[in-house]
Amino acid sequence: SLRKDGPLPDTFPYHSLEQDRGRIFIGDSVLLASYPAGFLGSIAVQKDLYQTSTTANIKDIFTFQSGLVDLFSVGGNAVAQKGSSGSAVVDLNTGRVLGIIVTSSNGETTAERDLHAIVFAHMSESMKKDVGFTLEEFLSGDPSAEAALFQKNVSPALLQILSQYSPSGQAPR
């Protein structure tokens, strides 16, 4: 248990992931929530880091090769700071998570920046192509079983690669 007053709950509330890239449009209203630290020093991050949230509209959409939405822009806002990467972007109409914040352009102020989020459907399709299962399949799986499979099937090859670059010729354990 990580709680002083008792065990953790069996389940936690969550927002579903939007897997249909055809439901993401310029102008859609979204909620951004993060822990931006762009204007805090190292000591302040430890003591004064607070959640920030704001609403925004999707300003632009981008595709990589598929012709479908892979990345979208939500413009500049209070969340457009370092430390926001990995934070959720939630569709205000459906409550579904559209994607996660991954990049921001540079700018003197947050209003001058352009914040970007990668679409979950793109991540899920990339995972399916690369590792054989979607993001939702991974998230709904058994973490202990996945860890055991990783330890058995992937870890030995990674340790071999690491040992090639270790001064001692030994992989870290």
Label the model's feature ranges.
Residues 15, 25-28, 156, 160-163:
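Solvent-exposed, polar/charged alpha-helical surfaces in well-ordered, non-transmembrane soluble domains
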Residues 125-173:
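PDZ/PDZ-like groove recognition
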Residues 17-50:
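Short glycine/Trp-rich loop-beta-loop segment that forms part of the substrate-binding cleft
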Residues 2-15, 42-137:
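Active-site region of chymotrypsin-like
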